[in-house]
Curated annotation (Swiss-Prot):
Main localisation: cytoplasm
Binding site for IMP: 23-26, 48-51, 139, 153, 234, 249, 313
Cofactor: Mg(2+)
Lineage top rank: taxon: Bacteria
Species, as recorded: Chlorobium phaeovibrioides (strain DSM 265 / 1930)
Annotated protein name in UniProt: Adenylosuccinate synthetase
One cellular component (GO) term of this entry: cytoplasm
HAMAP family: Adenylosucc_synth (MF_00011)
Amino acid sequence: MESKPFSLPSQSATVLIGTQFGDEGKGKLVDYLSDQYDIVVRYQGGANAGHTICFDGKSVVLHLIPSGIFNEKCVCVIGNGVVIDPVALLEEIATVEALGYEVKGRLFISHNAHLIMPYHKRLDSLSESAQGDQKIGTTGRGIGPSYEDKFARKGIRVVDLLNAEVLQEKLRENLAQKNRLFTTIYDGEEIDVESMVREYEEFDKIIDPYITNTQLYLNRQLREGRTVLLEGAQGSLLDVDHGTYPFVTSSNPTSGGACTGSGIAPNHIGKVIGVCKAYMTRVGNGAFPTELFDETGEELGRVGHEFGATTGRKRRCGWIDLVAMRYAVAVNGITELALTKLDVLDGFEEIQVCNSYTLDGKEIFDFPTDHETLSRVKPVLTPMKGWMASNADARNFEEMRPAAKQFVEFLENELEVPVTFISVGPGRNETVFR
Protein backbone atom coordinates (compact mmCIF):
# COMPACT_ATOMS: atom_id res chain seq x y z
CA MET A 1 0.00 0.00 0.00
CA GLU A 2 1.35 3.42 -0.96
CA SER A 3 2.03 5.57 2.11
CA LYS A 4 0.70 9.10 2.35
CA PRO A 5 3.23 11.94 2.56
CA PHE A 6 3.55 13.58 5.96
CA SER A 7 2.16 17.10 6.20
CA LEU A 8 3.88 19.48 8.61
CA PRO A 9 1.84 21.86 10.81
CA SER A 10 1.37 25.24 9.18
CA GLN A 11 2.59 27.33 12.15
CA SER A 12 0.09 29.90 10.89
CA ALA A 13 -1.35 30.60 14.35
CA THR A 14 -0.14 33.54 16.44
CA VAL A 15 -0.71 34.02 20.17
CA LEU A 16 -1.12 37.56 21.50
CA ILE A 17 -0.83 37.89 25.26
CA GLY A 18 -0.37 40.47 27.99
CA THR A 19 3.00 40.42 29.73
CA GLN A 20 1.95 42.39 32.82
CA PHE A 21 -1.13 42.56 35.10
CA GLY A 22 -3.60 42.96 32.22
CA ASP A 23 -4.90 46.19 30.66
CA GLU A 24 -1.84 46.35 28.38
CA GLY A 25 -3.74 47.57 25.32
CA LYS A 26 -4.23 44.22 23.59
CA GLY A 27 -7.53 45.33 22.05
CA LYS A 28 -5.95 47.98 19.85
CA LEU A 29 -3.32 45.56 18.60
CA VAL A 30 -5.82 42.79 17.85
CA ASP A 31 -8.05 45.27 16.03
CA TYR A 32 -5.06 46.41 13.97
CA LEU A 33 -3.69 42.92 13.28
CA SER A 34 -7.05 41.36 12.44
CA ASP A 35 -6.60 42.59 8.85
CA GLN A 36 -3.78 40.05 8.56
CA TYR A 37 -5.66 37.06 9.99
CA ASP A 38 -8.67 35.07 8.85
CA ILE A 39 -9.82 34.11 12.35
CA VAL A 40 -9.46 35.70 15.80
CA VAL A 41 -9.98 33.45 18.84
CA ARG A 42 -10.60 34.34 22.47
CA TYR A 43 -9.29 31.40 24.52
CA GLN A 44 -9.78 32.09 28.27
CA GLY A 45 -11.38 34.33 30.86
CA GLY A 46 -14.83 35.80 30.68
CA ALA A 47 -16.62 39.12 30.98
CA ASN A 48 -14.11 40.18 33.65
CA ALA A 49 -11.76 41.59 31.01
CA GLY A 50 -12.59 44.56 28.82
CA HIS A 51 -10.83 45.26 25.53
CA THR A 52 -11.19 48.86 24.36
CA ILE A 53 -11.08 49.53 20.61
CA CYS A 54 -10.95 53.05 19.15
CA PHE A 55 -11.98 53.57 15.50
CA ASP A 56 -13.92 56.08 13.41
CA GLY A 57 -14.10 58.42 16.39
CA LYS A 58 -15.78 55.74 18.52
CA SER A 59 -14.56 53.92 21.62
CA VAL A 60 -16.05 50.44 22.08
CA VAL A 61 -15.44 48.04 24.97
CA LEU A 62 -15.82 44.30 24.34
CA HIS A 63 -15.65 41.69 27.09
CA LEU A 64 -16.36 38.39 25.32
CA ILE A 65 -16.47 38.85 21.55
CA PRO A 66 -12.94 38.98 20.07
CA SER A 67 -11.74 42.41 18.98
CA GLY A 68 -11.52 41.28 15.34
CA ILE A 69 -15.31 41.53 14.98
CA PHE A 70 -14.91 45.07 13.58
CA ASN A 71 -12.94 43.71 10.62
CA GLU A 72 -15.68 42.49 8.30
CA LYS A 73 -13.42 39.90 6.64
CA CYS A 74 -12.57 38.29 9.97
CA VAL A 75 -14.29 35.35 11.66
CA CYS A 76 -14.36 35.40 15.48
CA VAL A 77 -14.36 32.41 17.81
CA ILE A 78 -15.06 32.17 21.54
CA GLY A 79 -13.10 29.09 22.55
CA ASN A 80 -13.74 26.27 24.98
CA GLY A 81 -11.52 27.88 27.64
CA VAL A 82 -13.81 30.90 28.03
CA VAL A 83 -16.60 31.08 30.62
CA ILE A 84 -19.63 32.78 29.06
CA ASP A 85 -22.33 34.89 30.66
CA PRO A 86 -25.20 34.52 28.14
CA VAL A 87 -26.76 37.83 29.18
CA ALA A 88 -23.49 39.72 28.68
CA LEU A 89 -22.88 37.95 25.36
CA LEU A 90 -26.28 38.91 23.94
CA GLU A 91 -25.74 42.51 25.03
CA GLU A 92 -22.41 42.57 23.18
CA ILE A 93 -23.91 41.06 20.04
CA ALA A 94 -26.58 43.79 20.10
CA THR A 95 -23.92 46.49 20.58
CA VAL A 96 -21.87 45.27 17.62
CA GLU A 97 -24.94 44.96 15.39
CA ALA A 98 -26.09 48.47 16.38
CA LEU A 99 -22.78 49.77 15.02
CA GLY A 100 -23.64 48.25 11.64
CA TYR A 101 -21.54 45.06 11.78
CA GLU A 102 -22.88 41.62 10.90
CA VAL A 103 -22.37 39.03 13.66
CA LYS A 104 -24.26 35.93 12.47
CA GLY A 105 -21.99 33.79 10.33
CA ARG A 106 -18.93 35.60 11.71
CA LEU A 107 -19.08 34.54 15.37
CA PHE A 108 -18.78 30.95 16.56
CA ILE A 109 -19.05 29.82 20.18
CA SER A 110 -17.50 26.60 21.44
CA HIS A 111 -20.08 24.05 22.47
CA ASN A 112 -17.67 23.04 25.26
CA ALA A 113 -17.36 26.50 26.82
CA HIS A 114 -18.81 26.74 30.32
CA LEU A 115 -21.60 29.10 31.32
CA ILE A 116 -21.65 31.71 34.05
CA MET A 117 -24.94 31.46 35.90
CA PRO A 118 -26.62 34.02 38.21
CA TYR A 119 -25.64 31.93 41.22
CA HIS A 120 -21.97 32.22 40.22
CA LYS A 121 -22.19 36.02 40.34
CA ARG A 122 -23.89 35.96 43.71
CA LEU A 123 -21.31 33.53 45.11
CA ASP A 124 -18.50 35.70 43.74
CA SER A 125 -19.84 38.77 45.53
CA LEU A 126 -20.61 36.98 48.81
CA SER A 127 -17.28 35.16 48.92
CA GLU A 128 -15.31 38.34 48.20
CA SER A 129 -17.17 40.25 50.91
CA ALA A 130 -16.41 37.50 53.42
CA GLN A 131 -12.66 37.75 52.74
CA GLY A 132 -12.26 41.04 54.60
CA ASP A 133 -8.66 42.29 54.33
CA GLN A 134 -7.73 39.25 52.22
CA LYS A 135 -9.94 40.23 49.27
CA ILE A 136 -8.59 39.21 45.88
CA GLY A 137 -10.21 42.17 44.15
CA THR A 138 -12.44 40.22 41.76
CA THR A 139 -14.75 41.94 39.29
CA GLY A 140 -17.78 40.18 40.79
CA ARG A 141 -18.74 38.77 37.38
CA GLY A 142 -18.87 35.13 38.54
CA ILE A 143 -15.69 34.06 36.74
CA GLY A 144 -14.02 32.24 39.65
CA PRO A 145 -17.11 30.30 40.79
CA SER A 146 -17.80 29.23 37.20
CA TYR A 147 -14.27 27.86 36.83
CA GLU A 148 -14.64 26.18 40.23
CA ASP A 149 -17.68 24.29 38.95
CA LYS A 150 -15.84 23.45 35.74
CA PHE A 151 -12.97 21.77 37.55
CA ALA A 152 -15.29 20.18 40.10
CA ARG A 153 -17.07 18.67 37.04
CA LYS A 154 -20.36 20.28 37.99
CA GLY A 155 -20.40 23.01 35.35
CA ILE A 156 -23.07 23.71 32.77
CA ARG A 157 -21.71 24.02 29.24
CA VAL A 158 -22.99 25.80 26.15
CA VAL A 159 -23.92 22.47 24.57
CA ASP A 160 -26.32 21.83 27.48
CA LEU A 161 -28.50 24.69 26.22
CA LEU A 162 -29.36 22.47 23.25
CA ASN A 163 -30.91 19.72 25.38
CA ALA A 164 -33.76 20.92 27.60
CA GLU A 165 -33.84 17.76 29.75
CA VAL A 166 -30.10 17.84 30.45
CA LEU A 167 -30.21 21.57 31.16
CA GLN A 168 -33.11 21.22 33.62
CA GLU A 169 -31.43 18.33 35.45
CA LYS A 170 -28.09 20.15 35.79
CA LEU A 171 -29.72 23.40 36.88
CA ARG A 172 -31.74 21.65 39.58
CA GLU A 173 -28.70 19.74 40.86
CA ASN A 174 -26.54 22.87 40.95
CA LEU A 175 -29.18 25.08 42.54
CA ALA A 176 -29.92 22.52 45.24
CA GLN A 177 -26.29 22.78 46.34
CA LYS A 178 -25.93 26.54 45.80
CA ASN A 179 -29.15 27.35 47.65
CA ARG A 180 -27.85 25.45 50.67
CA LEU A 181 -24.76 27.68 50.60
CA PHE A 182 -26.84 30.84 50.27
CA THR A 183 -29.10 30.00 53.20
CA THR A 184 -26.78 28.20 55.65
CA ILE A 185 -23.38 29.83 55.05
CA TYR A 186 -24.26 33.31 53.84
CA ASP A 187 -27.67 33.68 55.53
CA GLY A 188 -29.24 34.77 52.24
CA GLU A 189 -32.20 33.90 50.06
CA GLU A 190 -32.64 30.98 47.70
CA ILE A 191 -32.72 31.37 43.91
CA ASP A 192 -35.96 30.12 42.35
CA VAL A 193 -35.20 27.00 40.32
CA GLU A 194 -38.15 27.06 37.92
CA SER A 195 -37.73 30.69 36.85
CA MET A 196 -34.06 30.06 36.05
CA VAL A 197 -34.92 26.93 34.06
CA ARG A 198 -37.40 28.94 31.96
CA GLU A 199 -34.92 31.80 31.45
CA TYR A 200 -32.08 29.58 30.26
CA GLU A 201 -34.26 27.49 27.99
CA GLU A 202 -34.98 30.73 26.12
CA PHE A 203 -31.26 31.35 25.53
CA ASP A 204 -31.08 28.25 23.33
CA LYS A 205 -33.29 29.84 20.67
CA ILE A 206 -31.08 32.93 20.47
CA ILE A 207 -27.58 31.48 20.84
CA ASP A 208 -28.10 28.26 18.84
CA PRO A 209 -26.94 29.73 15.46
CA TYR A 210 -23.55 30.58 16.97
CA ILE A 211 -22.79 27.24 18.67
CA THR A 212 -20.32 24.88 17.00
CA ASN A 213 -17.50 22.43 17.67
CA THR A 214 -14.82 25.11 17.48
CA GLN A 215 -11.94 22.69 18.09
CA LEU A 216 -12.77 20.84 14.87
CA TYR A 217 -13.56 24.07 13.05
CA LEU A 218 -10.23 25.71 13.92
CA ASN A 219 -8.13 22.68 13.02
CA ARG A 220 -9.91 22.30 9.68
CA GLN A 221 -9.31 25.97 8.92
CA LEU A 222 -5.61 25.63 9.74
CA ARG A 223 -5.32 22.58 7.47
CA GLU A 224 -6.91 24.59 4.67
CA GLY A 225 -4.32 27.35 5.05
CA ARG A 226 -6.25 29.90 7.12
CA THR A 227 -4.40 32.10 9.61
CA VAL A 228 -5.45 32.34 13.26
CA LEU A 229 -4.81 34.97 15.92
CA LEU A 230 -5.33 33.77 19.51
CA GLU A 231 -6.28 36.67 21.78
CA GLY A 232 -5.61 36.39 25.50
CA ALA A 233 -7.41 38.27 28.27
CA GLN A 234 -5.83 39.68 31.45
CA GLY A 235 -2.03 39.30 31.69
CA SER A 236 0.69 36.76 32.40
CA LEU A 237 1.26 37.96 35.97
CA LEU A 238 -2.39 37.12 36.72
CA ASP A 239 -2.10 33.53 35.46
CA VAL A 240 -3.50 31.08 38.02
CA ASP A 241 -0.35 28.92 37.79
CA HIS A 242 2.39 31.42 36.92
CA GLY A 243 1.07 34.66 38.40
CA THR A 244 1.12 36.35 41.80
CA TYR A 245 -1.01 33.67 43.46
CA PRO A 246 -3.47 33.98 45.20
CA PHE A 247 -4.00 37.45 43.70
CA VAL A 248 -4.62 36.06 40.22
CA THR A 249 -7.41 35.29 37.80
CA SER A 250 -8.98 31.82 37.57
CA SER A 251 -7.59 30.83 34.17
CA ASN A 252 -4.35 30.69 32.15
CA PRO A 253 -3.73 33.86 30.10
CA THR A 254 -0.22 32.57 29.27
CA SER A 255 0.62 31.01 25.91
CA GLY A 256 -0.01 27.45 27.12
CA GLY A 257 -3.60 28.43 27.83
CA ALA A 258 -4.01 29.40 24.18
CA CYS A 259 -3.69 25.75 23.19
CA THR A 260 -5.86 24.23 25.91
CA GLY A 261 -8.46 26.99 25.58
CA SER A 262 -8.84 26.66 21.81
CA GLY A 263 -8.00 23.07 20.89
CA ILE A 264 -5.13 24.19 18.64
CA ALA A 265 -1.96 22.14 19.11
CA PRO A 266 1.34 23.87 20.09
CA ASN A 267 3.04 22.95 16.81
CA HIS A 268 0.63 25.24 14.95
CA ILE A 269 1.94 28.28 16.87
CA GLY A 270 4.42 30.29 14.82
CA LYS A 271 4.67 33.52 16.84
CA VAL A 272 3.97 34.66 20.38
CA ILE A 273 3.49 38.43 20.64
CA GLY A 274 3.77 39.91 24.13
CA VAL A 275 1.97 43.19 24.77
CA CYS A 276 3.31 45.59 27.40
CA LYS A 277 2.63 49.15 28.48
CA ALA A 278 5.49 51.63 28.63
CA TYR A 279 4.71 51.73 32.36
CA MET A 280 2.67 49.32 34.52
CA THR A 281 -0.75 49.18 36.14
CA ARG A 282 -2.63 46.79 38.36
CA VAL A 283 -6.29 46.55 39.40
CA GLY A 284 -7.27 45.07 42.73
CA ASN A 285 -5.00 43.71 45.44
CA GLY A 286 -1.64 41.98 45.23
CA ALA A 287 2.07 42.83 45.22
CA PHE A 288 3.21 45.52 42.77
CA PRO A 289 6.94 46.26 43.29
CA THR A 290 7.15 49.42 41.15
CA GLU A 291 3.88 50.99 42.32
CA LEU A 292 4.01 54.77 42.77
CA PHE A 293 2.17 56.39 45.66
CA ASP A 294 3.09 59.99 44.79
CA GLU A 295 2.06 62.65 42.28
CA THR A 296 3.93 60.81 39.51
CA GLY A 297 1.66 57.81 39.96
CA GLU A 298 -1.39 60.07 39.94
CA GLU A 299 -0.13 61.74 36.76
CA LEU A 300 0.32 58.39 35.00
CA GLY A 301 -3.26 57.50 35.93
CA ARG A 302 -4.67 60.84 34.75
CA VAL A 303 -2.83 60.95 31.43
CA GLY A 304 -3.33 57.25 30.75
CA HIS A 305 -7.04 57.28 31.75
CA GLU A 306 -6.33 54.32 33.99
CA PHE A 307 -9.74 53.12 34.99
CA GLY A 308 -10.90 49.53 34.47
CA ALA A 309 -12.89 48.96 31.26
CA THR A 310 -15.03 46.37 33.07
CA THR A 311 -15.42 47.74 36.60
CA GLY A 312 -14.42 51.41 36.29
CA ARG A 313 -12.04 50.90 39.20
CA LYS A 314 -9.00 53.15 39.43
CA ARG A 315 -5.84 51.31 38.42
CA ARG A 316 -2.68 51.41 40.50
CA CYS A 317 0.22 52.85 38.47
CA GLY A 318 3.99 52.36 38.52
CA TRP A 319 7.13 52.27 36.40
CA ILE A 320 7.81 49.46 33.93
CA ASP A 321 9.21 46.36 35.64
CA LEU A 322 11.72 44.44 33.51
CA VAL A 323 12.26 41.78 36.19
CA ALA A 324 8.61 40.79 35.87
CA MET A 325 8.71 41.09 32.10
CA ARG A 326 11.79 38.87 31.74
CA TYR A 327 9.79 36.25 33.63
CA ALA A 328 6.79 36.73 31.31
CA VAL A 329 9.03 36.45 28.23
CA ALA A 330 10.41 33.13 29.50
CA VAL A 331 7.11 31.60 30.64
CA ASN A 332 5.37 32.42 27.35
CA GLY A 333 8.19 31.91 24.84
CA ILE A 334 7.60 35.43 23.54
CA THR A 335 9.11 36.04 20.10
CA GLU A 336 8.36 39.76 19.78
CA LEU A 337 6.96 42.63 21.84
CA ALA A 338 4.29 45.25 21.23
CA LEU A 339 4.81 48.41 23.30
CA THR A 340 1.66 50.40 24.05
CA LYS A 341 0.81 53.76 25.61
CA LEU A 342 4.24 55.24 24.94
CA ASP A 343 2.41 58.55 24.49
CA VAL A 344 1.47 58.59 28.19
CA LEU A 345 5.15 59.24 28.96
CA ASP A 346 5.41 62.19 26.52
CA GLY A 347 5.23 64.79 29.29
CA PHE A 348 7.74 63.29 31.74
CA GLU A 349 11.20 64.88 31.99
CA GLU A 350 12.55 61.69 33.56
CA ILE A 351 11.39 58.09 33.28
CA GLN A 352 12.33 55.24 35.58
CA VAL A 353 12.87 51.59 34.63
CA CYS A 354 13.13 48.74 37.13
CA ASN A 355 15.84 46.25 36.13
CA SER A 356 16.37 44.43 39.45
CA TYR A 357 15.04 44.17 43.01
CA THR A 358 16.56 44.16 46.45
CA LEU A 359 15.40 41.50 48.89
CA ASP A 360 16.60 41.73 52.48
CA GLY A 361 19.43 43.98 51.32
CA LYS A 362 20.58 41.69 48.48
CA GLU A 363 20.13 42.55 44.79
CA ILE A 364 18.16 39.94 42.81
CA PHE A 365 17.33 39.72 39.12
CA ASP A 366 14.77 36.90 39.11
CA PHE A 367 11.04 37.37 39.67
CA PRO A 368 9.94 35.70 42.94
CA THR A 369 7.20 33.19 42.24
CA ASP A 370 5.63 33.32 45.71
CA HIS A 371 3.58 36.33 46.73
CA GLU A 372 4.99 36.64 50.25
CA THR A 373 8.52 37.13 48.89
CA LEU A 374 7.39 39.40 46.07
CA SER A 375 5.61 41.66 48.54
CA ARG A 376 8.94 42.27 50.34
CA VAL A 377 11.12 43.24 47.36
CA LYS A 378 12.14 46.83 46.60
CA PRO A 379 12.66 48.02 43.01
CA VAL A 380 16.09 49.16 41.82
CA LEU A 381 15.27 51.97 39.38
CA THR A 382 17.34 53.23 36.46
CA PRO A 383 16.56 56.84 35.43
CA MET A 384 16.20 57.65 31.73
CA LYS A 385 15.78 60.98 30.00
CA GLY A 386 12.25 61.76 28.83
CA TRP A 387 11.49 63.13 25.35
CA MET A 388 8.98 65.83 26.36
CA ALA A 389 7.22 65.78 22.99
CA SER A 390 4.64 63.77 21.08
CA ASN A 391 5.53 60.95 18.70
CA ALA A 392 1.94 60.73 17.39
CA ASP A 393 2.92 61.76 13.86
CA ALA A 394 5.68 59.14 13.59
CA ARG A 395 4.94 56.20 11.31
CA ASN A 396 8.39 54.64 11.36
CA PHE A 397 11.00 54.26 14.07
CA GLU A 398 13.41 56.82 12.66
CA GLU A 399 10.77 59.56 12.92
CA MET A 400 10.45 59.11 16.69
CA ARG A 401 12.15 61.38 19.23
CA PRO A 402 15.74 60.28 20.04
CA ALA A 403 15.05 59.72 23.75
CA ALA A 404 11.92 57.69 22.91
CA LYS A 405 13.98 55.50 20.58
CA GLN A 406 16.60 55.03 23.30
CA PHE A 407 13.87 53.91 25.71
CA VAL A 408 12.60 51.31 23.22
CA GLU A 409 16.11 50.06 22.45
CA PHE A 410 16.88 49.77 26.17
CA LEU A 411 13.85 47.52 26.63
CA GLU A 412 14.88 45.37 23.68
CA ASN A 413 18.43 44.93 24.93
CA GLU A 414 17.39 44.05 28.47
CA LEU A 415 14.60 41.66 27.47
CA GLU A 416 16.44 40.23 24.43
CA VAL A 417 13.26 40.39 22.37
CA PRO A 418 12.57 42.78 19.46
CA VAL A 419 9.91 45.48 19.83
CA THR A 420 8.02 45.33 16.53
CA PHE A 421 4.96 47.47 17.33
CA ILE A 422 4.83 50.80 19.17
CA SER A 423 1.58 52.59 19.99
CA VAL A 424 2.27 56.35 20.01
CA GLY A 425 -1.36 57.44 20.54
CA PRO A 426 -4.85 56.01 21.13
CA GLY A 427 -5.92 56.23 17.48
CA ARG A 428 -5.82 53.17 15.24
CA ASN A 429 -3.24 54.73 12.94
CA GLU A 430 -1.07 56.23 15.67
CA THR A 431 1.21 53.25 15.40
CA VAL A 432 4.83 52.54 14.49
CA PHE A 433 5.78 49.17 12.98
CA ARG A 434 9.37 47.95 12.79
